[in-house]
């Protein structure tokens, strides 16, 4: 591992804005957020995967993985981030290093040769070049190659030196954000600047969720100047330093980006959520309050209240038919980050009982919010293996499991329906109408008549009386 990467990791692990990190002792803080991974054995959840997760939703950028093909293919496009324009981010590019390339030291030459066809064929706004375990171990200088390619062909080539063995996926999120801070943010200036320009950081545009929120901001005259990284363009990231306010959606992943932008450019930030009716309203109010503090027209606050009242009324009217069908249902929520409290709060608004919510990838602030919403910490669940998840579903008598697609088989074994609310989902649930869609999905699952048939005993296990199995009438044959 290079000294530059070691220094960057030490800086990220000592993040003052991270509530989890601030509660650690000096010894634990030095140890880092996770154990170092073994080079070559870090597939899934490694730092490289985290960097890809954070940066791949920038849609007009070519993402080139400098590694053997497996590093590129195993984690490609693992989030259903949507684009309103370019589909370039869905194309995969790799140098496909072979053993001979590695042994003979051809890595840097192969990378340089790979950049030319990508730039000439795709005309990307930029090329992000990712290091992996192999290329970090053999010492390929991505910075030098990217600099030479930028000078030769004009397209910005950004090195993202985040090998998998550097640490956990969460660390990779942060290091990916550091690459943007060091190489992209501030590279371009916007043609016009308004007093109502904002950044949205930590939203990945899953299934187009950002599109459910953007119309609300448009109605208030608020412009999303910078987005990291849902449905973002390279220029949006490059101009993010001119925004007036930053909303941080997932602090566990990119708190370092929001804090450093506040330090360098004086942009205040807050953590909010667009899941649920009340949380969406609160986030809109907070954005407007901070914008007014930064010089936006004061009537923005009144216009925000009018918009919130109108949208809340529409949402509650749309939810009215579903409330009696889902009220009282017991929900086990196994997700992570800010959704551990924001989705729980949204479900409670509709009269559902959250019997448990997971504490994966949460900060101390997230835990405090869960306690505030749930009343105590008895409903908190730490990381659960499938066997434990099955036991929790049964012990807590859950009516539905809200989790990721990989947990659907656990729910099926426990004979309870499941709704996908994690990164693999195909339906957006953000904003006011997103909450309506989520409740519709829950209603569609828990009230499906097939569950009664599934839970009923098999005909051969039923009693040999009544209408299930009866002796045929008529004369004996």
UniProtKB/Swiss-Prot annotation:
Q: A Pfam family in this protein?
A: Oxidored_nitro
Has keyword Cytoplasm? Answer: no
Ordered alphabetically, the record's keywords are: Nitrogen fixation
Q: Which GO terms describe its biological process?
A: nitrogen fixation; protein-containing complex assembly
Q: Does the keyword 4Fe-4S apply?
A: no
Give the SUPFAM superfamilies listed for this entry: Helical backbone' metal receptor
Pathway where it operates: Cofactor biosynthesis; Fe-Mo cofactor biosynthesis
Checking Gene3D superfamilies in the record gives: Nitrogenase MoFe cofactor biosynthesis protein NifE, C-terminal, Nitrogenase molybdenum iron protein domain
This entry's Gene Ontology molecular function terms read: nitrogenase activity
Q: Which family does it belong to?
A: Belongs to the NifD/NifK/NifE/NifN family.
Report the function annotation for this chain: This protein may play a role in the biosynthesis of the prosthetic group of nitrogenase (FeMo cofactor).
Q: What is this protein called?
A: Nitrogenase iron-molybdenum cofactor biosynthesis protein NifE
Q: Gene symbol?
A: nifE
């Amino acid at each position: 591992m290079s000294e530059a990467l070691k220094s960057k990791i030490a800086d990220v692990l000592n993040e003052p804005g991270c509530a989890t990190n601030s509660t650690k002792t000096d010894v634990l803080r030095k140890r880092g957020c996770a154990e170092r991974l073994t080079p070559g054995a870090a597939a899934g959840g490694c730092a490289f995967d985290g960097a890809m997760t954070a940066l791949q939703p920038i849609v007009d950028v070519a993402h080139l993985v400098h590694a053997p093909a497996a590093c590129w293919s195993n984690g490609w496009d693992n989030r259903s981030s949507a684009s309103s324009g370019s589909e370039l981010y869905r194309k995969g590019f790799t140098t496909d290093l072979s053993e001979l390339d590695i042994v003979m030291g051809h890595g840097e030459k192969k990378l340089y040769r790979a950049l030319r066809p990508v730039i000439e064929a795709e005309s990307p706004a930029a090329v992000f070049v990712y290091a992996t375990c192999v290329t970090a171990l053999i010492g390929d200088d991505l910075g030098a190659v990217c600099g030479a390619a930028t000078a030769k062909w004009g397209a910005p080539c950004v090195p993202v030196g985040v090998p998998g063995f550097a640490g956990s996926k969460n660390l990779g999120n942060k290091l990916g954000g550091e690459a943007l801070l060091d190489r992209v943010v501030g590279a371009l200036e916007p043609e016009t600047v308004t007093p109502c320009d904002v950044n949205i950081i930590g939203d990945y545009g899953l299934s187009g969720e950002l599109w459910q929120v953007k119309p609300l901001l448009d109605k208030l005259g608020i412009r999303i100047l910078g987005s990291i990284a849902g449905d973002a363009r390279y220029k949006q990231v490059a101009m993010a330093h001119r925004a007036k306010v930053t909303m941080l959606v997932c602090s566990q992943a990119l708190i370092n980006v929001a804090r450093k932008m506040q330090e360098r450019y004086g942009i205040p930030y807050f953590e909010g959520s667009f899941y649920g009716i009340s949380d969406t309203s609160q986030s809109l109010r907070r954005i407007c309050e901070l914008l007014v503090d930064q010089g936006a027209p004061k009537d923005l606050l009144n216009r925000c209240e009018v918009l919130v009242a109108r949208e809340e009324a529409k949402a509650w009217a749309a939810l009215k038919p579903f409330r009696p069908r889902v009220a009282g249902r017991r929900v086990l929520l196994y997700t992570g980050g800010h959704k551990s409290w924001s989705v729980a709060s949204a479900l409670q608004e509709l009269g559902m009982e959250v019997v448990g919510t997971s504490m994966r990838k949460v900060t101390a602030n997230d835990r405090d919010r869960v306690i505030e919403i749930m009343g105590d910490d008895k409903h908190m669940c730490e990381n659960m293996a499938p066997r434990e998840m099955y036991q929790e579903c049964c012990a807590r008598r859950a009516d539905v499991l809200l989790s990721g697609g990989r947990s659907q088989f656990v729910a099926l074994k426990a004979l309870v329906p499941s709704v996908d609310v994690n990164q693999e989902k195909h339906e957006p649930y953000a904003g006011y109408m997103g909450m309506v869609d989520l409740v519709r999905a829950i209603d569609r699952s828990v009230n499906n008549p097939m569950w009664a048939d599934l839970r009923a005993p098999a005909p051969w296990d039923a009693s040999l009386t009544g209408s299930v199995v009866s002796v045929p009438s008529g004369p004996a044959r």
